[in-house]
Amino acid sequence: MTVHFPFQNSYSALPDSFFARVAPTPVAAPRLIKLNRPLAVQLGLDPNMLETPEGAEILAGKTVPDGADPIAMAYAGHQFGQFVPQLGDGRAILLGEVIDRDGVRRDIQLKGSGPTPFSRRGDGRAALGPVLREYIVSEAMYALGIPTTRSLAAVVTGEHVIRETALPGAVLTRVAASHIRVGTFQFFAVRRDTDAIRRLADHVIARHYPELLGTERPYHALLAGVVARQAELVARWLLVGFIHGVMNTDNSSISGETIDYGPCAFMDAYNPAQVFSSIDEMGRYAYANQPRIALWNLTRLAECLLPLFGEEQEKAVEQAQDILGAFPETFSKAYQAGLRKKVGLFTERDGDEALIQDLLDAMAKNQADFTLTFRRLGDAAGDPAADDARAEFMDPAAFDEWARRWRERLAAEPQSAAERQTAMNAVNPLFIPRNHRVEAVIQAAVNDDNYALFEELVKVLAKPYEDQPDYAAYADPPLPDQRVLQTFCGT
């Protein structure tokens, strides 16, 4: 019995300059570590078949399923502000596309499946640690309600990859609305290939923004659509304390999904200047810098689209600037609305923004845990005697002074205390992928081939907003000797 993938490929039908055709490199002894069964069903796949040895071979790239048209996508990108005219998929191969049960076209890609023409002296492989990290964090982001690529499966290859040392090799099966990036447009812009830019833009509109088909200025509207999605996405990141870590233009998705989880991390103690990525030495992609960087990336996209805006270059630049000018307001609106919900304010009044900023300033000064402070505020909103939020502050008096003003403001809200607590708990997670927990999972898997911690963490993070008494310890911030100070890309 064969494993069937109902491929309906479109990107591989574009001109050859958009990609390189390349098959995955077979591996020695693939073994399935984790299959995301609900996602498999959503994609129209048979999870029981994927869990067979034959399924593991496909998910590891050892065999290519019928209907696949494997390609490595071409793109360029600004990496930490420096432009690289050719990057491309150096260790990822797009098997093809399927239409899921909601009628949405989804890419199925293998990460770590061997070298491609874009590998730049790399081995095209992935180590087990980064594969598990992306599986954990991408699925946690999905459960948090944040647009993201998904993880269908993690497979160990039976081979080792050489990084600083020999590490177990693995392959991640990644699912995305698409893998088209700002850097994809840059690849053709630097080559002055306007026809390819138009072809790519038309493909993106048909795939991600079909409501723009037939409009008077579709390319202007496309830029506006990407600006809006990115502004709202980054606002959602900030609202859960997420730091992407490597917001290069080749990691900026046109569909508005979070993509590429290399050195990502969630904050423990609130610090607007927080950086975890070992390669972000200047703090370019620090927590509070993320909106500014998103706009910078979108400006690079706008530059690529200018030739499609019309022959009058000066006018085209003005139009692009007007569209980009919507980003700050769109971001601020989404971010402030989210913050109000996090503190239980479901109507908008003068002074709300200042009240919330005072809380954030006090949290930063007191090194209060970002996630738990907001979650405990929900408890305090439901029960005035609850003081768990107060316990997050080194100077409890600082919280008391703020809480007095907050309660006065809550009195003007129409909800009952119980309704408010329920609403706050629906936006303030209790469980996030704490860095020390992710690290413990990786160490157990890499050193002992033990995946019990991995399974348990994935299970807990699937319900981030629910109280899970049996797993309460997963909500705890790290002890001083458990703190993860740096994260690594793993490539």
UniProtKB/Swiss-Prot annotation:
Kindly list the cofactors needed.
Mg(2+); Mn(2+)
Active site annotation, chain numbering: 250
Q: Summarize where ATP binds, as residue positions.
A: 88, 90-91, 111, 123-124, 174, 181, 260
**Which cysteines are disulphide-bonded?**
none
Q: What is its EC number?
A: 2.7.7.-, 2.7.7.108
Domain of life of the organism encoding this protein: Bacteria
Q: Which Pfam families match?
A: SelO
Question: Which catalytic reaction applies to this protein?
Answer: L-seryl-[protein] + ATP = 3-O-(5'-adenylyl)-L-seryl-[protein] + diphosphate; L-threonyl-[protein] + ATP = 3-O-(5'-adenylyl)-L-threonyl-[protein] + diphosphate; L-tyrosyl-[protein] + ATP = O-(5'-adenylyl)-L-tyrosyl-[protein] + diphosphate; L-histidyl-[protein] + UTP = N(tele)-(5'-uridylyl)-L-histidyl-[protein] + diphosphate
Which molecular function terms from Gene Ontology are attached? Answer: AMPylase activity; ATP binding; magnesium ion binding
**So where does Mg(2+) get bound?**
251, 260
Q: Give the record's family classification.
A: Belongs to the SELO family.
Q: What does this protein do?
A: Nucleotidyltransferase involved in the post-translational modification of proteins. It can catalyze the addition of adenosine monophosphate (AMP) or uridine monophosphate (UMP) to a protein, resulting in modifications known as AMPylation and UMPylation.
Name of the protein described by the UniProt record = Protein nucleotidyltransferase YdiU
